């Protein structure tokens, strides 16, 4: 905590500017961003309207099918965003993100506030996703289910997590041998 992970994601998404350094994204990269506070949601709208207003070419049936995949069925789709729990807002944000044409998803703590079933939906959606995904998470189970590569931010530098594990194993081994 406090190492700048969220700030880095915001820089990559151009929400904030970097103090120094540069980065370049490919010319065809379209970013989809998921933040912990769900700033993309409009509190005064219903779940259904939140999707239909952003994706007006979708039919009512298509919208209901997408929302059902994120556990919103029947009259639930007409609940106002402001009345939803954190986990429910997370599911709406994820539904919007998966509908976007983004080919690079940036997710900040995507499993926060999600129940087990919602986490499984997210895991399946990410595992089926064909683009690039960069996320910050402390949820070890989620990481194990979805990550193909793990980086650790140590002293403002990314380190391959496999190397971090090996270093820790060597340290523990030395401690055990010295006893």
Segments from the language model and where they lie:
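ABC ATP-binding cassette signature C-motif
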Residues: 1-171, 179
């Amino acid at each position: 905590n406090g190492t700048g992970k969220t700030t880095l994601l915001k820089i990559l998404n151009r929400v904030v500017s970097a103090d120094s350094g540069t980065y370049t994204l490919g010319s065809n990269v379209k970013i989809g961003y998921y933040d912990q506070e769900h700033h993309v949601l409009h509190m005064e709208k219903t779940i259904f309207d939140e999707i239909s207003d952003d994706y007006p070419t979708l039919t009512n049936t298509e919208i209901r099918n997408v929302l059902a995949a994120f556990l919103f069925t029947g009259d639930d789709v007409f609940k106002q965003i402001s009345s939803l729990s954190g986990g429910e807002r997370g599911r709406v944000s994820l539904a919007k993100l998966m509908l976007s044409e983004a080919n690079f998803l940036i997710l900040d703590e995507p499993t926060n506030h999600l129940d087990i079933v919602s986490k499984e939906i997210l895991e399946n959606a990410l595992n089926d996703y064909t683009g690039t995904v960069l996320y910050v998470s402390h949820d070890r189970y989620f990481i194990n289910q979805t990550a193909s590569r793990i980086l650790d931010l140590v002293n403002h530098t990314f380190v391959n997590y496999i190397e971090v594990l090996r270093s820790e194993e060597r340290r523990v081994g030395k401690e055990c041998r010295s006893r």
